[in-house]
Amino acid sequence: MAAMASTAFAPSVSSTTNKLFDSSFHGAPMSPSLLRLQPIKSSRPNNLSISASASPPYDLNTFKFDPIKESIVSREMTRRYMTDMITYADTDVVVVGAGSAGLSCAYELSKNPNIQIAIIEQSVSPGGGAWLGGQLFSAMVVRKPAHIFLDELGIDYDEQDNYVVIKHAALFTSTIMSKLLARPNVKLFNAVAAEDLIVKGGRVGGVVTNWALVSMNHDTQSCMDPNVMEAKVVVSSCGHDGPFGATGVKRLKSIGMIEEVPGMKALDMNSAEDAIVRLTREVVPGMIVTGMEVAEIDGAPRMGPTFGAMMISGQKAAHLALKSLGQPNALDGTYVGGVHPELILAAADSAETADA
């Protein structure tokens, strides 16, 4: 069901308006001295001081761990996990898919301490495709104004006229995960698949879950019944089509709740990212679709290796969920506190199919 925390410490600079060099986007040659890009924008001052002679706070020659019984380790893991399963068996929001859209959605939701969020991720490693940029390269490109979200997370980047570049995509994914999972109202269930939906009276009311390895082997074994997780709102962020992709909307089609899943169209970055954010919505009662799964249900273009729409689509999905729950949100003007400019841009309710 994949949709798709350490922060980079780099030299900070003064103004967001200063440019290190004129963008070479249109082919202008760069000076050799500028071929090694340096960050020209940092979200916070760099107060880190590292000494090469610093030693660990213990003697590495005589180090020994405190003793422990093996059964204690087993009990600690089992007790805590089972407690989480009991706690989140009936929850406010289930986010299916922990890619960049799903993580951004859960992060935004978790700011409200009254909302309980469960994240279901079929992979052992959450993050979806957001551990790398395009073609397995390292850098992550984010178009403005989505960089405001990166500022909130405290992630450094190189700033250009209309976009920013994080030196490694893993910095975004690890940072948002570490901040998100530290919050008391969030639980990530990774290596867990959402096999089906709970539907009552025409409304999605939760998900049917199973261990991911069990879900992948139903053809080889029998009698491996699932479990369930009820939720007031389900956010489907299962990514584009694939073995575990777009499974939320594909299931809606198979049970007759939507008419078709036309699939995403050919790549067009400019129209794709705007369309993904604009078309993020509650597609059937109780189920919100976000991220690249939006392109699958609406026939919007694919965006390729740019990630801003994933973040802002996730944020919009969170505020749609808050609205559904009767909580303050940025879409109807009831949100308390500062609202990101990009969320105002994302507040359109139009469900118009994108024209590729």
From Swiss-Prot:
Instruction: Name the cofactor(s).
Output: Fe cation
PTM comment text: During the catalytic reaction, a sulfide is transferred from Cys-223 to a reaction intermediate, generating a dehydroalanine residue.
Record's catalysed reaction(s): [ADP-thiazole synthase]-L-cysteine + glycine + NAD(+) = [ADP-thiazole synthase]-dehydroalanine + ADP-5-ethyl-4-methylthiazole-2-carboxylate + nicotinamide + 3 H2O + 2 H(+)
Q: What does this protein do?
A: Involved in biosynthesis of the thiamine precursor thiazole. Catalyzes the conversion of NAD and glycine to adenosine diphosphate 5-(2-hydroxyethyl)-4-methylthiazole-2-carboxylic acid (ADT), an adenylated thiazole intermediate. The reaction includes an iron-dependent sulfide transfer from a conserved cysteine residue of the protein to a thiazole intermediate. The enzyme can only undergo a single turnover, which suggests it is a suicide enzyme. May have additional roles in adaptation to various stress conditions and in DNA damage tolerance.
Gene this chain is encoded by: THI1
**Entry's family note:** Belongs to the THI4 family.
Q: Which residues form a coiled coil?
A: none
Tell me which EC number(s) this protein carries. 2.4.2.60
Q: List residues, modification 2,3-didehydroalanine (Cys).
A: 223
Can you provide one Gene Ontology molecular function annotated for this UniProt record? iron ion binding
Q: What is this protein called?
A: Thiamine thiazole synthase, chloroplastic
To which species is this protein native?
Citrus sinensis (Sweet orange)
Entries under HAMAP family matching the protein: THI4
Instruction: Give binding positions for substrate.
Output: 101, 121-122, 129, 194, 225, 240, 292, 302-304
Quaternary structure, per UniProt, is:
Homooctamer.
Q: Where in the cell is it found?
A: Plastid, Chloroplast
Co-factor: note: Binds 1 Fe cation per subunit.
Transcription regulation among keywords: no
